[in-house]
Amino acid sequence: RDDVLTYLEENGCYTIAITNLPDLFEKYRLCYGQYKYVKFALGFHPELVYKYKNQIDKFRSNIRYTRYIGEIGADFTTEDYREREIQLEILSEIVSVCNQYDDKILSVHTRKAEKQVLEILNNCKSQVILHWYSGTIREIEEAIEKGYYFSINHQMIRSNNGKKIITKIPLERILIESDAPFTMGLEKNYSIKFMDDIYKFLSVTRNVDEEQLGIILKNNFRTILTQG
């Protein structure tokens, strides 16, 4: 992963690098905080909060070092109801802490917990990006009405449900993510070429040439940084 960060920096790729625990954010901020193109997000991944819930204090103490928050959220693939409760409690606390600032941008995980997460986000004053969204079309419409953005990756265009979801999102609300190393083809070797397939898919489905598409997507990124 250190090689990936160096690759992004050397290639001038503006990137928000997501972390999954406050410990890791702290580590990478100290090691790579001087990078120009790569900025680190303070994360507390829902699948880890039950085991590491004591790190919420470290989350609070590190939030002043970044405006980027993620990955956070809830993941109800677990059948443990106590774990689900803890996920929602931690998410609510994170939203509350972020509301004390006026510049936070949140990358939010919602897998199988879209309804519950969107309810908590009703109280959120920060800008929201829904990461690898896989919920219902009705909830997409609700999120769009609230001004949320959606980050999509190349693995989404390899499933019918993923493609269906992407076609329902306004082009002006789309951001590109890799979700490496958890997506196909990026487990070991990272390259920004993963974006090529996304550009081709969006170009065909939206009838927009790739050059214009690039302008729109870059503008989306600039816009959310300005609004956050």
Question: Language-model segments: which ranges?
Answer:
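Mid-domain alpha/beta scaffold segments of enzyme catalytic cores
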Residues: 1-228
